[in-house]
Amino acid sequence: MRTIEIRKVSITFLDTDAIVNAANEGLFAGGGVCGAIFKAAGYEQLQKACDRIGHCDTGSAVITPGYNLKSKYIIHAVGPRWKDGRHKEPEQLYGAYYKSLELAAANHCGSIGFPLISAGIFGYPVHAAWRQAFDACGDYLDQHKDVSLHIVFAALSDEIIETGQKTLLESGASRYKIAGRNDWARLDMPEQRDTFIFQRTFTAQQMASLRHGHIPRQMEDKWFWFMEGDTLFAHRSWTGFCIFRIDFKPDNHHVVTVNRNPDQYTCTSTAEDAQKLNELLNWWIQDPYDYYHEWLDETADALKAAGKNIPEKHPSIIIR
């Protein structure tokens, strides 16, 4: 799973394999996030571990056990104090994140939790701090395609979270964002609906791809989907109509609710629905999801149904 998400939670409550402490160069307990982590981990034992290390340069990171935390490790990352942005603050903040990710991977972590480093008492502007965070995380995942790492950012301020969500969508790391209901314009499932049982087995990796969801980015992106708990909501990107809702079940007999408003979805047969859904899921469980060739397939099928002559589905559609 190679994903990025933002949660409204105290970082000390995360159960990721590692959490990151917004540390200082002396590695002593401070205020804010740092103080909360020391308190939750156990001040005396964590301070002893930090004292053995002694120092960490700004823009770098070191690692200690997590002690009383749910996380196995604490990565202590030292971000810069904000001056004016012209004293290597962006490079140092980027480095603190990147080094933290390297340490997480080196210690076989599958997940890591970050605070918004330097945005508290160190005074780094929130939007700029988010930008460096996402640039570093996106670059790391791009450059280490063999690493499976789920990245969680923990924050408590609604304003900081909202800024983070917007900045993530604007950044190059947006493809790693876990989709949520507020990431795209959408409509709820109408009252006109049917349900049927859909039997299919999914691997853990395939379910991880579905849980990642998908936020459309190109005109050819025809679907927006996201998961809440064990329920997947699939919306048409151009209209926002909710076409399918899938409640995944442990026995692999999943409950599907399908849109029956003829102005939103024209299919009326559950057999056709099941076939269509199965085809869609074959695309959506891919990592990465190939929306463009899904669009080619779907467009080709529609043109064929309309009696058009289509010599080839791939790599292009030609109408005679």
PLM feature segments, named:
Residues T231-P250:
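Canonical SH2 domain fold
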Residues M1-A106:
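Glycine-/small-residue-enriched capping loops at alpha/beta junctions
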Residues N107-G110, M227-D230, K249-H253:
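A short, structured loop/turn motif at beta-sheet edges
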Residues R81-A173:
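Phosphate/ribose-phosphate-bearing ligand recognition and processing surfaces
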Residues N252-R320:
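Polybasic, proline/glycine-rich intrinsically disordered low-complexity segments
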Residues A173-G229, I317-I319:
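Negatively charged, low-complexity tracts enriched in Asp/Glu with abundant Ser/Thr
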